[in-house]
Regions:
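Helix-coil boundary/capping segments in enzymes
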Residues: 1-215
Length: 215
């Protein structure tokens, strides 16, 4: 789903996120592989690679009427190269449509956006406006600056125009240490900070006037 230009970039350089880890490893090196439960791995593949497996395990097994996809990795969100981030976000949205949403009516997608580039994010949201396959816009709770900062407002304005809520998934690629005391050694230290990162974003959205501007 990537153009040849950005596929070459990905295979040559990989993803360059702001976190201080090397070698293209996932941001949860201390956690379960792919940050997923062991029973989420289908036979012969990785999580989110087998629609039938997911359909049986999560939709049919629990009588789920609607499930919303939150594509996390690799989605390009938070990449240092804004052009690549936008290309990956667009490709991820196209992948959702072809591999999942058009094949399973109970699924809805999240509009993945390159949130550190608000103009590109707004363009991606407007490109998906009116598509009933998408239920929300997806951001992460650890952005480079607090989410209420005016630099992110074009994202929220485009979401309002499209009639889509904005969802924040815990974690992200801000480059800042995950705890007030610095970088942690264990996963339990990281995961306990997810709640506070979300709380901080809500406070920022309120005090910066986002809800007043976009009620």
């Amino acid at each position: 789903f990537l153009s040849a230009r950005w596929w070459e970039h990905l295979t040559t350089w990989g993803m360059r996120q702001r976190h201080g880890y090397t070698g293209g490893q996932p941001p949860f090196p201390k956690a379960q592989p792919m940050a997923s439960r062991r029973d989420a791995w289908p036979p012969g593949g990785t999580p989110c690679s087998d629609l039938d497996f997911m359909r049986f395990q999560l939709l049919d097994n629990y009588g789920t009427d609607v499930g919303i996809l939150n594509p996390l990795q690799p989605s390009g969100q938070g990449d240092r190269n804004n052009g690549f981030s936008a290309a990956m976000a667009h490709a991820t949205n196209e992948w959702q449509l072809e591999a999942w949403l058009r094949k399973e009516p109970r699924l809805r997608g999240s509009v993945v956006v390159p949130y550190e580039d608000s103009a590109a994010s707004a363009a991606e949201i407007r490109a998906r406006a009116g598509d009933p396959n998408f239920a929300q816009v997806l951001m992460m709770s650890r952005t480079a600056e607090p989410a209420g900062n005016p630099r992110y407002w074009p994202i929220y304005e485009a979401a309002v125009e499209a009639g889509l809520p904005v969802a924040f998934h815990a974690f992200g690629y801000s480059g800042w240490a995950m705890t007030n005391g610095g970088w942690p050694s264990f996963y339990i230290e990281e995961v306990s900070e997810h709640a506070t990162s979300c709380q901080n974003q809500v406070i920022s959205l309120v005090v910066e006037g986002v809800f007043e501007r976009l009620p």
